[in-house]
UniProtKB/Swiss-Prot annotation:
Organism the protein comes from: Trichosanthes kirilowii (Chinese snake gourd)
Keyword Hydrolase appears in the UniProt entry: yes
Full protein name: Ribosome-inactivating protein trichokirin
Family in the record: Belongs to the ribosome-inactivating protein family. Type 1 RIP subfamily.
Signal peptide region: none
Coiled-coil residues: none
Keyword Iron: no
Reactions the enzyme catalyzes: Endohydrolysis of the N-glycosidic bond at one specific adenosine on the 28S rRNA
Enzyme Commission designation: 3.2.2.22
GO terms, biological process: defense response; negative regulation of translation
Free-text description of this protein's post-translational modifications in UniProt: Glycosylated.
Catalytic class of the enzyme: hydrolase
Length: 16
């Protein structure tokens, strides 16, 4: 599965 997280600060985290 792929998960995409966007924090309020504007940083994006992409985990495979």
């Amino acid at each position: 599965d792929v998960s995409f997280s966007l924090s309020g600060g504007g940083t994006a985290s992409y985990e495979k």
